[in-house]
Amino acid sequence: MLKFTAEHEWLKFEGDIATVGITSHAAEQLGDLVFVELPEVGATFAKDGDAATVESVKAASDVYCPLDGEVVEINQAIVDDPSLVNSDPQGAGWFFKLKLSNAADAETLLDEAAYKELIA
């Protein structure tokens, strides 16, 4: 199941674990990324908490935690090579995996059609 947020993040769910990243739209708006800072494994966040930071040649932006949960894995590859986020934002450019406090909260997120309408 793939869901989206109004803050341009995507979540792919596998049970109570969500892989989180920024959308292709967000990556295009930011331009070429030069720096990514990710949360530490074990960090817990409330929905909309500042979970990560990205910097591009144009701007710096926070990446928010889309749901309450605990970070169980990070993608070190994008720290080492931020351009992965630009080249494959909804694949190899994922940010972190989140163990959800309440998996039912996923129902509050946007589906793909609603997200496409938001960015149209």
Swiss-Prot record:
| PROSITE patterns given in the database record | BIOTINYL_LIPOYL (PS50968), LIPOYL (PS00189)
Which of the residues bear the PTM N6-lipoyllysine?
A: K58
Name all Lipoyl-binding domain ranges: 17-99
Q: Which GO terms describe its cellular component?
A: cytoplasm; glycine cleavage complex
Gene Ontology BP terms: glycine decarboxylation via glycine cleavage system
Name the family. Answer: Belongs to the GcvH family.
Q: Describe its assembly.
A: The glycine cleavage system is composed of four proteins: P, T, L and H.
Q: Could you tell me what this protein is called?
A: Glycine cleavage system H protein
Q: Source species, please?
A: Agrobacterium fabrum (strain C58 / ATCC 33970)
- List the lineage, top down: Bacteria, Pseudomonadati, Pseudomonadota, Alphaproteobacteria, Hyphomicrobiales
